[in-house]
Amino acid sequence: MKKILGIFRGFPGLGRVVSGVSLLETLRDEYGCCIEIISYLQGNRYLELKGYENLHEVVPMDYCSIGLLPTNVTGAYIHEKIRCFQPDIVIIDGEPLIIQALKISYPKLKIVALLNPADIENEQNDQDAMRYFNAMYSLSDLAIVHGLRSVSNTGNYKKLVSVNTILRKEILDVNINSTNNIYCLLGGGT
């Protein structure tokens, strides 16, 4: 049985947690994988709603504007989780510093980065910052870019796959009924 650990950015929104959890639950339910999930802040509130228990809580010094810091309490917790759980694959969404830290500590560990197209190409962001983020994300063994637009590998990534937006199973199971009501779903930065 494959063991998969998911580490999903828990703020400022839920987009990275929702898609990551959906992917892990599909791997568990459809392919028999054993899964563990780490998130924080709003991400943990979502996991609680989904029935997950015994969630690790961050302290303010555990994270910054670009995500988790690998050198504080939660960073140590992630390393301990990897040593105890011994995952075959770690799927990380929105945590560039964690990808780098895990590749330093566990160079043979297979890491998959879930990314938005704007994580790879974004003219609105400072381009020096984009080069930094791409350097961190490209340390992964596989980058899965999911969104409304396709991106190509500029040669920095070991393997990059660009796919349409990952849809939750609940959305695919919706029954369509004709009504005069209009509904709008908001979310996501891209």
Question: Predicted regions span which residues?
Answer:
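An aromatic- and histidine-rich active-site surface loop
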Residues: R45, V90-S105
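Generic beta-sheet signal
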Residues: I38, V58, V112-P117, H146, ...
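Structural motif
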Residues: K3, D88-I89, L142, N181
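Active-site proximal beta-strand in glycosyltransferases
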Residues: I89, S105-N122
